[in-house]
């Protein structure tokens, strides 16, 4: 799917899987210590034994989330993240895209419900892969076999009687 005027084309499932397969480090911009926030749920999943990522929460108001040191900005990270996973409003994304380019990230990933044509233009024109309106947790689980046609494979919900 091409977004007219941005030069951005949405990567298909094969490309998204390749992005996750080659990535070793993920910076989670907008990470929260609040367990009811989506960013906390995704960080919890990505911290699990199912995943093998080095995780770097980014939030200037936090110092540690789920045992991970939290950093005030992408520039403060001790490594160059492969993926910059964004949990912020679409209006904030162009500035985050510029930061991702400046630190040398490979991928700008905007979470489910977040679309920013300007951020996509900034990142893609600098050679970054761009994923928008997709959840890293859902995509990883999907490719790792944790999702099925009926949804999440939790083993809890069933129509069968015990």
Describe each model-derived feature in a short phrase.
Residues 1-59, 66:
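Hydrophobic, well-ordered beta-alpha structural blocks that scaffold small-molecule cofactor pockets
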Residues 7-12, 65-94:
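Glycine-rich, highly charged phosphate/nucleotide-binding loops
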Residues 50-53, 103-106, 126-128:
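A short helix->loop->beta-strand "cap" motif at the edges of active sites that frequently abuts
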Residues 65-67, 81-82, 118-121, 139-145:
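Short, charged, surface-exposed secondary-structure boundary motifs
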Residues 81-115:
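Mid-chain, well-packed structural core segment of small domains
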Residues 112-139:
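Rossmann-fold NAD(P)-binding glycine/threonine-rich loop
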Residues 139-162:
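A charged, well-structured terminal subsegment
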């Amino acid at each position: 799917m091409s977004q007219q005027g941005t030069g951005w084309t949405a990567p298909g499932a094969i490309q998204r899987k390749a992005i996750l397969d080659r990535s070793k480090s993920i910076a989670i911009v907008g990470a929260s210590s609040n367990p009811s926030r989506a960013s906390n749920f995704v960080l919890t999943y990505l911290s699990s034994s199912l995943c093998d990522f080095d995780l770097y929460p980014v939030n200037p108001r936090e110092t540690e989330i789920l045992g991970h040191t939290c950093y005030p900005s992408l520039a403060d990270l001790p490594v160059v993240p492969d993926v910059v996973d964004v949990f912020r409003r679409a209006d904030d994304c162009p500035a985050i895209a510029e930061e991702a380019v400046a630190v040398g990230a490979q991928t700008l990933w905007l979470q489910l419900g977040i679309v920013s044509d300007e951020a996509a233009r900034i990142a893609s024109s600098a050679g970054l892969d761009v994923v928008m309106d997709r959840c890293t947790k859902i995509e990883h689980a999907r490719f790792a076999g944790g999702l099925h046609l009926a949804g999440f494979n939790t083993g809890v919900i069933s129509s069968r009687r015990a």
